[in-house]
Amino acid sequence: DPITNEIGKTIIFAVSQNHARKLTEILNEFAEQLYPGKYNSDFAVQVTSQVGDAQQMTINFTNNNLSGKTTWLEGYKSCKTRVCVTVGMMTTGYDCPDLLNICMMRPIFSPADFVQIKGRGTRKNTFEYTFKNELNEEETQRHEKEVFKLFDFFANCEYFEEKFDYDEKLKLPKPKKGGGEGGGGGIDIDKYTSYRPDPLATMVEEQIGEYGMRIDRELFKKFEDRIIMD
C-alpha cells in the first residue's frame, strides 16, 4: 500500500475450497510471525461458497471494512484484512479499485476467465489520506495507482501468450444417450506434501509493455473484426 507500506489488498484464486482454506491458514500464520499481534488471524480470509456471508465479505472488502479498519495508520480508509482467498467468486463483475495484487494459484484454460481475473487489477484508483500537520492544518496525501502485480503459479500467462490456439474452431459435444446415474464424484484430498523448490524463491518479475499481453490483442482484434463485418 503506497500510504501505509503494508501489503496491498490481494485476491488469491485457489484450486478448491480445501486449498483456499489451507492457504488462508498458512498466510495468517506467516502474518503473525512477521507482524505479531497486528492482524489476529484477520490478515487473510477465505471467501468461498462454503463460508457464511461470503457475498457480504466481498462487498466489505471493496468498501474497506472487512474485519474492520487497518491498524497501521489511524484514520486511513483501508481494511484490516489484506488477502481474500477464493475459488470462483470475485471474478466476473467484481470491482475493487484499490486492489494491488492478484495471485493465480490454479490453472486457467478459458481466455474469458483469464481476462476477467486479470481485469480485477486494472481498475484506476487514487489512494488518499487526510491528516493534520504541525500547524493543525489539514493536508491530503495522494498516490495514483499506476501498476498492479500478477503472481502466476501455473504458467497461465505463458499458456495464453504462446500455446493457446486462438483460431481453433470449437464443436459442441453431442448429448449422451442412456439413463445411467453417473459417477460418484471426485476424491477429497485434504493434505498434500510437496518437496519441490519454493517457486517464490526463483520467481521472475516481468513488466508488461505498452502493447499488453497477446490475449488482450487477440480479443480486441476479434471485436474489431466483428464491428467491421457489421
Can you describe what each PLM-predicted range is?
Residues A44-K177:
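Conserved RecA-like P-loop NTPase helicase motor core
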Residues D1-G37:
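Conserved helicase/translocase motor-coupling segment
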Residues K9, S41-A44:
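Residues that mark the start of a beta-strand
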Residues F154-D230:
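Long, largely alpha-helical accessory region at the distal end of helicase-like NTP-driven motors
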